């Protein structure tokens, strides 16, 4: 009895009996962006902390399907609706945000300024509309979280954290292109005459803070843009240099609710290649960036099983697929890729990270956001092949797949990246660091709520 009482007095965090943290996670209304938050959210929950996820209503079902508590904020705006408004064509704004270029050769101030303008007007402001930010600030002031974790597009998160005094950190789902581009822009701006200096992102944040009776010094604005620290699951050698504290952790895949098909439980009789253009790309843009039926025909004579993720609409327009192609609407990547020898994909975060975690050579056909950069990084590391969409044809893809299956050096390089990811702490191992950093950065206002 005495031992039981002693254990109870210790509480969830050892002899000090510290109360659990309140942790608020937030994400734009896009499934794959949210999926990358789930393992960290559950690690915190399993450690005894209170966890809630705030997002626009379009994401509510996805959040609750992951077993976490959803708090709808804002209207029903979503990434899909925004893309529909611009005509379903990512080209106009993608050309202003070429991160493969940003992270390579030095840029002009004009290019960097244009990039910051495009990001604030076409990404940050639409994804963080006034109603979403208003509801987030009200939630933070009411619930008083100790820590706010936010994915890199969701600036409603740090704004809400600033409003209630919570600590806050970004949780990345890919290379830190936003903060890398920001650092380049600030260096270039510092060399300009005062009258030429503009900062669209800081201006937008400043207006938003003023609406809620908040002010912030320049240093605080930069902290809101980049987080008080950054959680980064990228393999160490692929990690971009960025200002501020970076806390690495191991990527753990989460693909939503799924059921394994019987065929996936059996060992393949020949090399298996995953061919996926990504569910998120199909859902977001309503079309494919590459002529998949021609590409599959070009792989038809390989002594390999090609598992292609195609929805019913794609299948109906593809005609008869080659005999070595297994066409499926959806299969969880965390279950499929461990059985594969190579993967062809669009550069999406979940697929790319899961492939890297499994040590697979990757053929990346990428056009959007940071995907061209990821393809270039993998090619430079010797762990993959990068193909620009405009240069893609059946012969080029076939050559890339053959190389991925036969090149032992590529397989070894992919294995090195896998080892880098496995060397980092799991989300469960990350929790003590989050507890320490939260105590360090929380300014006290988050503790001013009534007794729980």
From Swiss-Prot:
Task: Quote the catalytic activity from the record.
Answer: tylactone + dTDP-alpha-D-mycaminose = 5-O-beta-D-mycaminosyltylactone + dTDP + H(+)
Its annotated pathway?
Answer: Antibiotic biosynthesis; tylosin biosynthesis
Bias (Basic and acidic residues) occurs at 1-16
Please give one Gene Ontology molecular function term for this protein: hexosyltransferase activity
Q: Which UniProt keywords apply?
A: Antibiotic biosynthesis, Glycosyltransferase, Transferase
Q: Which organism is it from?
A: Streptomyces fradiae
**Keyword Transferase included in the entry's annotation:** yes
Biological process annotations from GO = antibiotic biosynthetic process
Gene3D superfamilies recorded: Glycogen Phosphorylase B (3.40.50.2000)
Instruction: Tell me which family the UniProt entry assigns to this protein.
Output: Belongs to the glycosyltransferase 28 family.
Q: Describe the task this protein carries out.
A: Involved in the biosynthesis of the macrolide antibiotic tylosin derived from the polyketide lactone tylactone. Catalyzes the transfer of alpha-D-mycaminosyl from dTDP-alpha-D-mycaminose to the 5-hydroxyl group of tylactone to yield 5-O-mycaminosytylactone. It can also accept 16-membered tylactone and 12-membered ring macrolide.
Q: What is this protein called?
A: Tylactone mycaminosyltransferase
CDD domains in UniProt: GT1_Gtf-like
Which InterPro entries did the record assign? EryCIII-like_C (IPR010610), EryCIII-like_N (IPR048284), Glycosyl_450act (IPR030953), Glycosyltransferase_28 (IPR050426), UDP_glucos_trans (IPR002213)
Q: Which domain of life is it from?
A: Bacteria
Write down the EC number. Answer: 2.4.1.316
Q: How is its activity regulated?
A: The activity of TylM2 is substantially increased by the addition of the accessory protein TylM3.
Could you tell me which residues belong to the region Disordered? 1-20
Keyword Metal-binding recorded: no
């Amino acid at each position: 009895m005495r031992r039981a009482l002693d254990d109870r007095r210790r509480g969830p965090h050892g002899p000090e009996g510290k109360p659990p943290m309140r942790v608020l996670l937030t994400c734009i209304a896009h499934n794959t962006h949210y999926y990358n938050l789930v393992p960290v959210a559950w690690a915190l929950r399993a450690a005894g902390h209170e966890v809630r996820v705030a997002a626009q209503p379009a994401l509510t079902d996805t959040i609750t399907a992951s077993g976490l508590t959803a708090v709808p904020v804002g209207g029903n705006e979503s990434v899909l609706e925004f893309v529909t408004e611009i005509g379903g064509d990512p080209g106009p704004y993608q050309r202003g945000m070429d991160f493969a270029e940003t992270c390579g050769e030095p840029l002009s101030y004009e290019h960097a300024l244009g990039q910051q303008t495009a990001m604030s007007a076409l990404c940050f402001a639409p994804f963080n509309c006034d109603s979403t930010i208003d509801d987030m600030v009200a939630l933070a002031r009411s619930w008083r979280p100790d820590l706010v974790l936010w994915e890199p597009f969701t600036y409603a998160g740090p704004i809400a954290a600033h409003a209630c005094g919570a600590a806050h950190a970004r949780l990345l789902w890919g290379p830190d292109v936003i903060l890398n581009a920001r650092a380049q822009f600030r260096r270039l701006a510092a060399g300009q005459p005062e009258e030429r200096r503009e900062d669209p992102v800081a201006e937008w944040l400043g207006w938003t803070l003023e609406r809620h009776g908040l002010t912030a010094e320049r240093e605080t604005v930069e902290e809101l843009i980049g987080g008080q620290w950054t959680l980064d699951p990228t393999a160490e050698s692929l990690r971009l240099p960025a200002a501020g504290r970076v806390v690495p952790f191991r990527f753990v895949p989460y693909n939503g609710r799924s059921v394994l098909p019987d065929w996936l439980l059996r060992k393949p009789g020949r090399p298996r290649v995953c061919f996926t253009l990504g569910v998120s790309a199909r859902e977001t843009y309503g079309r494919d960036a590459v002529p998949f039926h021609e590409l599959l025909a070009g792989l038809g004579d390989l002594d390999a099983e090609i598992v292609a993720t195609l929805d019913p609409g794609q299948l109906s327009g593809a005609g008869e697929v080659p005999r070595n192609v297994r066409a499926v609407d959806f299969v969880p990547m965390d279950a499929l890729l461990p059985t594969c020898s190579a993967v062809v994909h669009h550069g999406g975060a979940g697929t790319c990270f899961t492939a890297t975690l499994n040590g697979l050579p990757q053929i990346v056909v990428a056009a959007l956001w940071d995907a061209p950069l990821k393809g270039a990084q993998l090619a430079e590391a010797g762990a993959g092949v990068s193909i620009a969409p405009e240069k893609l044809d059946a012969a080029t893809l076939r050559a890339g797949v053959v190389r991925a299956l036969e090149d032992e050096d590529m397989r070894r390089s992919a294995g090195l990246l896998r080892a880098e990811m496995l060397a980092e702490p799991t989300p469960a191992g990350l929790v003590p660091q989050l507890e320490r950093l939260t105590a360090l950065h929380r300014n006290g206002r988050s503790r001013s709520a009534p007794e729980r």
